[in-house]
């Protein structure tokens, strides 16, 4: 089974068991995004270098036994209306295209505490007012399971 087909819990178990690494998981996700992003428009912000560095650091902590949370090493996407310290958070609006929060939202903190590693920020309707992404300033997102369906 491909790493991309595993649930977050399954992937965390594989990483903890040494069957794969946080770096391999992040690389697989970023490669998939590279292949499909032009079609699906799922992301507003991705910093590949930062994501790979974070995965490397997570893997080092896993191997040292200091990162043991239930999502240790698992790549996660963060919705673009959740503040992420030092990472542009637009809420899918051009009004906030240069907003860089000085803090992490509590949901982001909890994911970090669980050991998750951020891939990037996902597209959404502007200010989360809808479910189709038709109002996103960054384009309409298509459902990756069925492009004829809305993602939300």
State where each predicted segment sits.
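Short, polar/charged, Gly/Pro-enriched helix-capping and turn/loop motifs at alpha-helix termini
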Residues: 40-43, 65, 69, 125
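Short glycine/serine-rich loop/turn segments
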Residues: 72-152
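Secretory-pathway/luminal and periplasmic proteins that interact with or process carbohydrate-rich
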Residues: 34-39, 60, 83-88
